[in-house]
Amino acid sequence: MFKKAAVFTDIHFGLKGNSKTHNLDCENFIDWFIEQAHEHGCESGIFCGDWHHNRNHLNLTTMSATIRSLEKLGSNFDNFFIFTGNHDLYYKDKRDIHSVNFSRHIPGITLINDFYQEDDVALVPWLVDDEWKKIPECKAKYMFGHFELPNFYMNAMVKMPEHGELRNTHFKNQEYVFSGHFHKRQQQRNIHYIGLSLIHI
């Protein structure tokens, strides 16, 4: 699927009431990310969900910053994969309406909106309904997703309680799992929450 990939997550364009400062910080981060990816020989890129912050609407200045950033990513990688996080979805329990659907029209961008596996890599958007049942059955060595797993820190102080069906033990077939969603960088066994792209204060 790829030789070497650069990965980031949870950039949340449009945060702080569509703050121009925040969106500019996001764009500057994208420039830095591309530079680092080139320096480290990454021909592919992956974004692990929550591109936008607001689930209900998109501000035009935020949309403009988003398009500029995705066009940069599409033109600087052989392939750049993006999948939906919960903040990208209009409904939390289904993925039919989301704020990054337009990205599939940008050259170089591959939008993943369903469980996808190629070779030894799986790309998994925000899970809905009983899709969690696919995780224990998946044999991919590497899995990238936007998972809400118990006993990981939701922030610096509070751990996610046990609720829902998905558990850490369901990832028994994966050597490495990389996830967005929780903003604190942390690891338990084979599961890595890669943390914030930049500090959202």
Q: Could you describe each region identified by the protein language model?
A:
Residues 2-4, 11, 15-116, 170-174:
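Core catalytic region of metal-dependent phosphoesterases/phosphodiesterases
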Residues 199-201:
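Conserved small/polar residues in nucleotide/adenosyl-binding loops
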